[in-house]
Amino acid sequence: MKPTGYFLIKSGHLIDAAQDWDFRSDVLIKNGEITVSGCNIDEDSLEQGFTTIDASGLVVSPGFIDIHAHLREPGFEYKETIASGTKAAAKGGFTTISCMPNTDPPIDNVSVVNFIHDRARSDGVVRVLPIGCVTKGRLGKELADMEEMASACLLYTSDAADD
């Protein structure tokens, strides 16, 4: 899900450790890509159709990653869904979350991994990386089929506690 739009973020405190950025700056973003950064970008020099965001006194940074989220779906949708959990993550500045396998059924096979991916694509607003179970049912007795889950792009495993 590639972001779209044309935004000029004015006067924000730009922080990006990967780029060694820590200064006040304007940032021009087009379709999810930073195209220009610098002080006092001239709005008159830009093509039409951008939205200006006043970030005075605010921090501008790349999206955060939550490596330990509990989305509760499937099985506990009365607590949270992939849609509601990813919306909350986005509101907090997170662009990627890893969801723990303490669902019902647990994320211990390829069909549940695929369910998470499919639901995240259809209902989610941030990237979701499911964390699969180390053992079937999170019971600690028999290893889950990690090779099968990896074939569905599963990157991590854990037999996470319930909360």
Language model features with spans:
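Metal-associated gating/positioning segment near the N- to mid-region
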Residues: 56-123
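A generic structural signal for alpha->beta connector loops
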Residues: 49, 94, 125-127
